[in-house]
A protein has these predicted regions:
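N-terminal pro-sequences and low-complexity stem/linker regions of secreted or lumenal proteins
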Residues: 1-459
Length: 459
């Protein structure tokens, strides 16, 4: 296929904690034959699992208040088990019911310390009207939507981001506590072979670009690449403009609020439009150099669903390795909840829906084939579907056939209220930052980010 000969740059932007149905469930494409498996606004779910006859409707969300979700829906393993299976563990046999989202969220504590209840939970889990998220909607209509892309495990950020780099989390399914984050960073627990070693072995270039913290640097095998391969997000723009973009680029958003630079990861309670602006910035930057754009594939992904409703049951899969197959809580034999995923390039078809099953390791399988890498990393990426050739064209689309200046689509908005405390993810990243500072003398990526709540960050 021509695209495999022509694509020289794969760029991955992975944001945080949104389900497919929440961001893309109501999107309708111009070609009626291309139907996204989304929602209608008539979906109902039990208000409480102990009383399944009492249901609530998950309606189309049109209120700007939905840009900020507070409290954050549960998205640890036990929460996801309730959401998917209706109980805080995976049953035997594992039959997903997808009926525990409202029940689980209703138990989260509000500002008064009391559970928010099913009515508020149902309202907070509404799937969004496409007009609320104009950037991702425009990209979905203009490029390829993957409506069977699942997170790699039913867990939170850390294990799923490990999967996108290493095709395994070494049996790790939770958000790390402070001591676990530190211990994992300092010991062999987080030392997995990654796609980056394989890229280097094949003579391919790569970089991780980050806003304030490089969560990827929690993987011990990447520490030796700190000086040459980890860069701030503004370096991405400079390298695109100069035509020096590496073969593989992984972009991490800013996870923390700072004056003049709000968190752009879309992790609740951060403002969704700040993430929309980052998506637009990455796209506009890449498209701004036509020579680079014509040789690029941008993959927009989310690490996990963040506790938000999705109606498609996650399928079974294979454990990546023995450490995962024998893990105590979960055997890593089922994917996590579906997440938004878009393929963006002049080489992809306009307004197409890809219904193949993918997870984050599909990205690794695709990169292996595209760049001639030596080996698969684990059993998981070895059996994962690579991107379907049917998504791609025999020749690239003209620049005028792709949308321009997506940044202009993002409405102005007041900043999100500052959270009273750090999320589990932010806390673990702060611990990682402290460890980096102690070990790397401030020279490691993210080592200087401990003060990121007081100083502006890139981009």
């Amino acid at each position: 296929m021509a695209w495999k000969d022509e694509i020289q740059h794969v760029v991955v932007l992975m944001l945080e904690n949104q389900s497919f149905d929440r961001l893309l469930g109501f999107v309708r494409l111009d070609d009626a034959s291309q139907r996204i498996d989304g929602v209608t606004g008539n979906e109902t779910t039990p208000a409480a699992l102990e009383d399944p006859a009492r249901v609530v409707r998950l309606e189309r969300g049109t209120a700007p208040a939905l840009y900020i979700t507070d409290p954050t829906p549960g998205h640890q393993f036990e929460d996801i088990a309730v959401q998917v299976f209706g109980q805080p563990r995976v049953p035997d046999p594992p039959t997903p019911t997808m009926n525990g989202f409202v029940d689980n969220y209703a138990r989260q504590a509000g500002p008064d310390g009391k559970p928010i209840g099913s009515e508020r939970a149902a309202a907070g889990l509404a799937c969004l009207d496409p007009a609320l998220v104009p950037v991702i909607t425009m990209l979905a209509k203009s490029f390829v939507v993957c409506d069977r892309w699942f997170s790699s495990c039913p867990g939170p950020t850390w294990p799923n981001r490990f999967f996108v780099h290493a095709a395994t989390s070494n049996g790790y399914i939770d958000s790390p506590t402070d001591m676990q984050a530190l211990a994992g960073f300092l010991t062999t627990r987080f030392r997995m072979r990654t796609i980056y070693e394989n890229l280097a072995a094949a003579g391919r270039t790569w970089a991780v670009y980050f806003g304030d913290h490089a969560q990827a640097f929690g993987i011990g095998t990447l520490h030796r690449y700190a000086r040459d391969n980890f860069r701030r997000l503004d370096a991405f723009a400079a390298e695109v403009a100069a035509g020096t973009l590496p073969h593989y680029s992984f972009l991490e958003p800013g996870y923390m609020d700072a004056p003049g630079s709000p968190a752009a990861d879309q992790h609740p309670p951060h403002h969704l439009l700040d993430g929309e602006r980052l998506i637009a910035w990455v796209y506009d930057t890449l498209r701004g150099n036509e020579a680079v754009w014509r040789k690029s594939l941008l993959v927009l992904l989310y690490d996990e669903h963040g506790g938000f409703f999705d109606h498609v049951p996650p399928p079974a899969t294979v454990p990546p390795d023995p450490a995962s197959a024998t893990a105590e809580k979960f055997k890593f034999d089922r994917l996590g909840v579906r997440v938004p995923a878009l393929l963006i390039s002049p080489w992809v078809r306009k307004g197409r829906v890809d219904h193949r099953v993918y997870d984050h390791t599909s990205l690794l399988a695709t990169v292996k084939g595209l760049f001639g890498l030596p080996d698969f990393l684990t059993r998981r990426d070895a059996q994962a579907n690579a991107l379907d050739d049917a998504n791609f064209l025999a020749a690239p689309r003209a620049l005028v056939d792709t949308p321009a200046n997506l940044t202009a689509l993002v409405p102005s908005h007041a900043p999100a209220p500052r959270a009273k405390k750090l999320s589990d993810l932010q806390q673990s990243l702060m611990v990682l930052s402290a460890a980096l500072g102690a070990i790397g003398g401030g020279g490691a990526p993210g080592a200087g980010a401990a003060g990121n709540r007081a100083e502006p960050q890139s981009p």
